[in-house]
From Swiss-Prot:
Organism: Nicotiana plumbaginifolia
Intrachain disulfide bonds: none
InterPro entries the record matches: G-protein_beta_WD-40_rep, RACK1-like, WD40/YVTN_repeat-like_dom_sf, WD40_repeat_CS, WD40_repeat_dom_sf, WD40_rpt
Name the UniProt record assigns to this protein: Small ribosomal subunit protein RACK1
GO cellular component: ribonucleoprotein complex; ribosome
Length: 326
């Protein structure tokens, strides 16, 4: 029986600070978009040849502080970003310009998402609110106080399930909440974490939600039932989670490594660690900077076909892993 694992295919360098988010196109085209604490968003062209896996095609600037999140519209024409400057921006990728600014949050925006039809936008902030917007930049609804989170809202996602349109949010109040998108009412509060929640992910079919953060434990939830299914121990703070688009895998970026679980057997398929020596051998220029700094992964994104995992790190590099059979 052949065993699948991941190998380093190359790196992508242009950001000068933490890579905070990675957005991959639905059509699997040769581009990705990344955001960074260097206040910029980069549109990359994937060359896939040699150690430099992609080259920066365009740098989008305008945010006045760290860009914390970026997502792509399903047609790949627009990117949506959220920043510690308190704003969201919708970017026209053809023109390389800001098409809309979304102003309303009173503190840092930590997470943004597009609905499946791209007609709705949701954002989460350190102001403890979740805002629902249309693409014109008009705020349609604010989820705040009452049933809402009592601390920073670190992550927000739309479920791809159109039968029961929902928003999933994670917070520093240690809970995950499920919201009914049609009326923005709370459907369930998922409690179980013993530390703040950094990240949530929804499975491609919309049935599962995974959450993770400070306590190093990934909790898997049944979204329809609002029930906890099981937990996975990562052993370190979790910064990002993502489901594979075509395998029953969950990928976690932790402060020690990237861990990939097979959710059927609940075993670790792979544990990816940075090897600076290997990287300097791969690339002609070598890596002189940050020899002694602790480097860890802060963002993840699978290619649409599930063959390639993009990972963004605190040293500003994107490391690209490919699936191989061994």
């Amino acid at each position: 029986m052949s065993h699948e694992s991941l190998v380093l295919r190359g790196t992508m360098r242009a950001h000068t600070d933490w890579v905070t988010a990675i957005a991959t196109p639905v059509d699997n085209s040769d581009m990705i978009v990344t955001s960074s604490r260097d206040k910029s968003i980069i549109v990359w062209s994937l060359t896939k040849d040699g150690p430099q896996y992609g080259v920066p095609r365009r740098r989008l600037t305008g945010h006045g502080h760290f860009v914390q999140d970026v997502v792509l519209s399903s047609d790949g024409m627009f990117a949506l970003s959220g920043s510690w400057d308190g704003e969201l921006r919708l970017w026209d990728l053809q023109a390389g310009t800001t098409a809309r600014r979304f102003v309303g949050h009173t503190k840092d925006v930590l997470s943004v998402a597009f609905s499946a039809d791209n007609r709705q936008i949701v954002s989460a902030s350190r102001d403890k609110s979740i805002r629902l917007w249309n693409t014109l930049g008009e705020c349609k609804y604010i989820i705040q106080d009452g049933d809402s989170h009592s601390d920073w809202v670190s992550c927000v996602r739309f479920s791809p399930n159109n039968l029961q349109p929902t928003i999933v949010s994670g917070s520093w109040d240690r809970t995950v909440k499920i919201w009914n998108l049609t009326n923005c009412k709370l459907r369930a509060t998922l409690a179980g974490h013993t530390g703040y929640v950094n990240t949530t992910a929804v499975s491609p079919d919309g049935s599962l939600c995974a959450s993770g953060g400070k306590d190093g434990v990934i909790l898997l939830w049944d979204l329809a039932e609002g029930k906890k299914l099981y937990s996975l121990e990562s052993g370190s703070i979790i910064h990002s989670l993502c489901f594979s688009p075509n395998r029953y895998w969950l990928c976690a970026a932790t402060e020690s490594s990237i861990k990939i679980w097979d959710l059927e057997s609940k075993t670790i398929v792979d544990d990816l660690k940075v090897d600076l020596k290997q990287e300097s051998e791969m690339s002609a220029e070598g890596t002189a900077s940050g020899k002694n700094k602790v480097i860890y992964c802060t963002s993840l994104g699978w290619s649409a076909d599930g063959s390639t995992l993009f990972s963004g790190y605190t040293d500003g590099l994107i490391r690209v892993w490919g699936i191989g059979r061994f």
